[in-house]
């Protein structure tokens, strides 16, 4: 789920997430096959960026990470990223010992005004995730391909929110990636969280 620090405290969010996780596990347990064959579920959060994110309580910040991976999904602003953004991401890495993963970069390519600063942070441990939908349109596919070839994309995800209008559609993106990139690259881009 999304964590918007301007709307709720980390403690309130974690309680809400715990309840949602329990409801999901209960629904899966009630299936005839008890969810055999379903992917492993790992709790995490997509944390909305704010300049003081790096100042959050370390325990709360760790609890927002994907399971025990130390990876924090961060939803970035769509306006231009100045040095304050890069400073915050760097402080998450070095002062909080958290690996930020920028969520759905395909929504904010243009916000990256300093690709060299982004590449430097990638070299320090920053991860970047792209939505599978970025590989469906001609223009978005061109940008996605350039970012993947430049080594800036570490994971491709579905951005699934529900089973109606935000389904986990990965097969088309996976097929395209396997066709146009090395098989090993495709496997890495679609790897499970924490691997």
Go through each PLM region and give its residues.
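Active-site environment of divalent metal-dependent phosphoester hydrolases
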Residues: 3-7, 49-50, 107-112, 135-139, ...
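Structured loop/turn residues at beta-strand edges in well-structured enzyme cores
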Residues: 67, 150-151
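Flexible, acidic glycine-rich loops studded with aromatic residues
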Residues: 142-145, 151-153
């Amino acid at each position: 789920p999304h964590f918007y620090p301007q709307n709720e405290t980390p403690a309130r969010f974690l309680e809400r997430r715990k309840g949602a996780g329990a409801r999901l596990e209960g629904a899966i347990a009630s299936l005839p096959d008890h969810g055999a064959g379903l992917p492993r579920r790992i709790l995490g959060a997509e944390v909305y960026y704010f300049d003081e994110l790096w100042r959050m309580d370390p325990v709360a910040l760790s609890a927002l990470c994907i399971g025990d991976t130390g990876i924090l999904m961060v939803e970035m602003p769509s306006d231009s990223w100045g040095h304050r953004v890069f400073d915050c991401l760097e402080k998450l890495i070095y002062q909080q010992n958290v690996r930020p993963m920028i969520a759905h970069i395909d929504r904010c390519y243009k916000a990256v005004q300093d690709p060299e600063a982004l590449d430097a942070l990638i070299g320090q441990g920053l991860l970047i995730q792209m939505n599978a939908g970025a590989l469906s349109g001609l223009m978005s596919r061109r940008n996605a391909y350039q970012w993947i070839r430049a080594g800036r994309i570490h994971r491709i995800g579905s951005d699934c929110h529900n089973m109606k209008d935000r389904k986990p559609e990965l097969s088309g993106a996976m097929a395209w990636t396997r066709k146009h990139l090395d098989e090993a690259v495709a496997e890495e881009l679609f790897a499970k969280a924490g691997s």
